[in-house]
Amino acid sequence: YFGSVGGGVWKTDDGGLEWSNVSDGYFQMGSVGAVAVSESDPNVIYAGMGESDIRPVMTSHGDGVYRSNDAGKTWSNVGLKKSRTISNIVIHPKDHNTLLVGVQGDQYKPSIDRGLYHSNDGGKNWKKVLYVNETTGISGLTMDRNNPRILYASTWDHLRKPWQMRSGGKGSGIYKSIDGGLNWKKLETGLPKIMGKTDVSVSGANSDIVYVIAEAEKSGLYRSDNGGKSFKLINSDRVLIARSWYYIHVFADPSDENVVYVLNA
């Protein structure tokens, strides 16, 4: 499955040779910011709407979260309709009804709907579990594959105007939860005091290793070897953070603790 900027959700059954749209007729908006497939039941898929990689030109908004129970054949909206932009979705590996959704929020004005939301009933009810301020949304979210109660989230303080794109502020940061996302603690040791857009990823091979890619005065790739207690800048090559305010992601390899992937524009 992949979510497109303007064409909904698409699916392939042959490893990517051919793709077909599976959301037409069900989605009210065409822009998808996140897609997640349940490990416990691959028929269950969640799609978060709204273009999460924003630019000074046209950026499309969305209308919440959609869920499919039949591998994409049909969809229904399950809430967060005021979110405007969703950047991340993670599903509990053993319970497809428990998930967290990162809301980046309205790109053009302050909004109290930003933040991280938790549901334990498949989207029937939502609880906001992490909120910083009206201009700070969620830009990254990762779950420890070895312990799904441990999660990391990155927040992004930003605002776009027709004449300006502001990326960064006191609201940007990295947070950790050890209770399934209900409570969060900010991680600061070794990280820049003021950051722009960031992303975070915990290693599936070694839960102590956490990577952060950060837009900041000291931009680059940061690594923690103690579960986020402290971080160290390990690579400041500017190629890693090119146009970071637009598109920046980091993924730790699930099986090799020394392999990490950084994506940018």
What do the predicted segments below correspond to?
Residues Y1-A265:
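Beta-propeller blade termini and top-face loops
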